[in-house]
């Protein structure tokens, strides 16, 4: 609010402008972290499969991520989020230079919120399935498959981390954009 | 940006001010819808149980929502979101009167985003479990329990609707707040 009596780029003091630029650079860093998180999750999950070695050549037990539809959704959602985040990087760089942009920030908030919902949905649906794989469920007669497929289970559990990290970073990104809008 | 040369409540034209007030009233309406959605979901899921009538008095098959930990999380998350949304209603009313508020809007965005993550997580984890209950999974040897517990399954499927609706409304709420911040 202070010094908002003028139009244009020069309406804020140098300190305030520096803080605004700092927020924009933080935005860029967070976006890169989120790209890494979602991409790592998608790749780690997408390359997961385990074949049981001790069965005959006729009956082979093999578990792939695509046997569980929820894990397929996890891979697709994380890939989409990662692609969007890479596309949004140039816009984030533009914001560092033009820190008073309004409409482009609103567009970024819109898509960031949508991607937050997508990544959160993927991460938590994945977590629900991974939990079942580890613990099973007595009343529904679903057995824990992790006793047979231990490396498969470790892998799908690990790939959740990147997705949950991306979720937290996306929340911070939305808040950063909101603060930047409020400071204009 | 237009007419931003003055401080205080009177800096915008009457039309622009009317639009701002309209956005705030929309915010209030959306919040009420989200309260109804999350509350209905929590209650519908929280009261779900089914006892199979055709078993003996010694062995009774009963399925309750709390047998599946994910569904318990669903109830808790929707209750928390619904409680937060009710608490946020007065602040939303204050925004109708004082449409240039900045910090209270930022606080609302912060909690709205957190609640969006919570509701999305609950809805999608619930959906993953409901999908399994309906379809089972061949490779993991998880059987579809909906063949035995049909009314249980209908109930838990139905209670997802309110949660997903609340998710969409929360996304719109965050966007409304962002637009309101940008229009200040």
UniProtKB/Swiss-Prot annotation, chains A, B:
Keywords: Cell membrane, Cell wall biogenesis/degradation, Glycoprotein, Membrane, Transmembrane, Transmembrane helix. It holds the Pfam family CASP_dom. The keyword Membrane applies. The chain crosses the membrane at residues 23-43, 73-93, 106-126, 160-180. Residues 1-22, 94-105, 181-184 are cytoplasmic. Glycans are attached at residues 49, 137. It is found in: Cell membrane. It is a multi-pass membrane protein. Residues 44-72, 127-159 are extracellular. Its main location: membrane. InterPro entries: CASP/CASPL, CASP_dom, CASPL. One of its GO terms (cellular component) is plasma membrane. Coiled coil: none annotated. It comes from the Eukaryota. One of its GO terms (biological process) is cell wall organization. Regulates membrane-cell wall junctions and localized cell wall deposition. Required for establishment of the Casparian strip membrane domain (CSD) and the subsequent formation of Casparian strips, a cell wall modification of the root endodermis that determines an apoplastic barrier between the intraorganismal apoplasm and the extraorganismal apoplasm and prevents lateral diffusion. NCBIfam families: A_tha_TIGR01569 (TIGR01569). Homodimer and heterodimers. Belongs to the Casparian strip membrane proteins (CASP) family. This is Casparian strip membrane protein 3.
